[in-house]
């Protein structure tokens, strides 16, 4: 579906769009079958050889729903919405819709281990929605770890060969930030991690390495019960600020919580195949750092620069765009997301979203590298209050990429080159005029980015800068020296 430039007015507000459950609850809704593979998700007996003609035409969509946290009820509702929408016919001659789901037994029950499932949703010959359990994982499995994420994706790849893979990742998140940093930055210490996986030739098979997703202390932040729940929240109350990296399993009891979180490099390394698209139904993932880390793992990526209200994407219409159509249309999913929020009012009229062509990101990196090199002193002199923010409270780690470059003193020619590079890679972008009544959005490039800080601001930025230097975006552009 093609989108044109469109301005939507809602009263005096304007928005710009452009185009270039618990175990028992889930078992009640399933018709179980003999699992295709073992509970470790290794994909035993899967077809890893040459694909047939039908397999080349097949589309596979995976919803990875990591809800062993405060989003439990919202993520269960998302799956029910998915079941109520368009469903593919029975395997093996039709497209595949898979859901990996893991939630707490009940709200706040973070000390009770539960069982994750991989299920397949389809419509039978009588038009009934069927949910088949393919894999039952061991109770206590941590879903927000690179090891489990890799196990699930490997099972999907080995057992459902296809010409097109897509994924929706739904959980808590805080973009490029390292695990544990967001909730308590003064306690963060950068510790280098081993590379957990390497690409072999032109494939994406893993070498036998150890994944290093480590639990970090959980610190419950303050919350404002008057605000809506967001997909970066920590507690069981609405309006809670976020503390996540990519995904979250919150484990333990009050006063002794720990959190399992993936960092963006771990997330990327754990992916064993190439995706056509990845859509993040999670907060603050819309950064250039995230996109660049994933550019060799997917062709397109959809994400939000701001937090995501807990209702998230529109799951009722999602499969119509991603599976029913001959060619998947992730842009339509992004558009549906934005339209459901621009129609709201007050704090609920809050959303940003962009769809990125990852194949065009290298040109953007070249342009930005030259600008960063030419305006090193300008970057250091930026007044943060002059730059477009995408964060609430004092979590000052997410600013608009173009706004940073403008404030650094880029020339007219440099800005022209930047705009041309952005136009090539930002397929779609949309934003509401305000976000939760806390800040206006006046500049929007389709990417957030870190605004480098030094020890004169806070001592822990030395640790954050050390971590940031390991990201592929910084290696390509030299933003942080």
Each model region followed by its residue ranges:
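Terminal, contiguous helix-loop blocks that mediate binding/assembly
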Residues: 24-26, 42, 194-481
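Surface-exposed loop and adjacent secondary-structure segments within mature catalytic domains
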Residues: 101-136, 164, 168-251
């Amino acid at each position: 579906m093609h989108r044109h430039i469109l301005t939507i007015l809602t009263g005096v507000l304007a928005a710009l769009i452009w185009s270039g459950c618990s175990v028992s609850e889930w078992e009640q809704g399933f018709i179980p079958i003999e699992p295709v593979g073992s509970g470790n998700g290794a994909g035993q007996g899967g077809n890893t050889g040459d694909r047939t003609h039908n397999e080349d035409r097949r589309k596979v969509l995976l919803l990875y729903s990591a809800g062993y946290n405060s989003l439990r009820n919202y993520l269960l509702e998302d799956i029910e919405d998915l079941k109520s929408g368009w469903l593919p016919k029975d395997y093996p001659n039709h497209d595949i819709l898979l859901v990996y789901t893991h939630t707490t037994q009940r709200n706040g029950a973070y000390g009770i281990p539960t069982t994750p499932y991989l299920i397949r949703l389809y419509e039978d010959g009588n038009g009934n929605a069927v949910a088949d359990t393919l894999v039952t994982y061991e109770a206590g499995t941590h879903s927000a770890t690179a090891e489990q994420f890799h196990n699930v994706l490997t099972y999907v790849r080995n057992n459902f060969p296809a010409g097109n893979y897509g994924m929706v990742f739904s959980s808590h998140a805080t973009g490029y930030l390292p695990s544990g940093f967001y909730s308590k930055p003064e306690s963060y210490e950068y510790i280098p991690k081993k590379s957990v996986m390497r690409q072999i030739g032109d494939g994406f098979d893993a070498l036998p390495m150890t994944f290093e997703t480590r639990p970090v202390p959980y610190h419950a932040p303050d919350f404002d019960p008057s605000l809506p729940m967001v997909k970066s929240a920590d507690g069981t109350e609405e309006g809670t600020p976020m503390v996540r990296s990519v995904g979250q399993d919150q484990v333990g009891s009050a006063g002794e919580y720990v959190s399992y979180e993936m960092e963006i490099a771990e997330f990327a390394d754990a992916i064993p195949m190439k995706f056509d698209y990845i859509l993040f139904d999670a907060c603050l993932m819309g950064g250039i750092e995230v996109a660049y880390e994933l550019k060799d793992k997917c062709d397109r990526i959809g994400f939000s620069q701001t937090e995501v209200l807990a209702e998230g994407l529109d799951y009722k219409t999602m499969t119509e765009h991603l599976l029913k159509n001959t060619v998947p249309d992730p842009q339509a999913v992004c558009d549906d997301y934005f339209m459901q929020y621009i129609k709201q009012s007050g704090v609920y009229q809050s959303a940003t979203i962009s769809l990125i062509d990852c194949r065009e990101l290298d040109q953007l990196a070249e342009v930005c590298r030259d600008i960063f090199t030419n305006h090193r002193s300008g970057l250091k002199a930026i007044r943060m209050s002059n730059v477009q923010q995408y964060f609430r409270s004092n979590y000052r780690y997410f600013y608009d990429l173009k706004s940073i470059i403008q404030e650094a003193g880029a020339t007219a020619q440099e800005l022209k080159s930047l705009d041309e590079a952005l136009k090539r890679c930002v397929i779609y972008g949309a934003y509401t005029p305000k976000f939760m009544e806390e800040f206006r959005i006046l500049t929007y490039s389709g990417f957030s980015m870190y605004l480098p800080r030094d020890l004169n601001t806070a001592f822990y930025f030395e640790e954050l800068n050390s971590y940031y230097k390991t990201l592929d975006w910084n290696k390509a552009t030299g933003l942080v020296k």
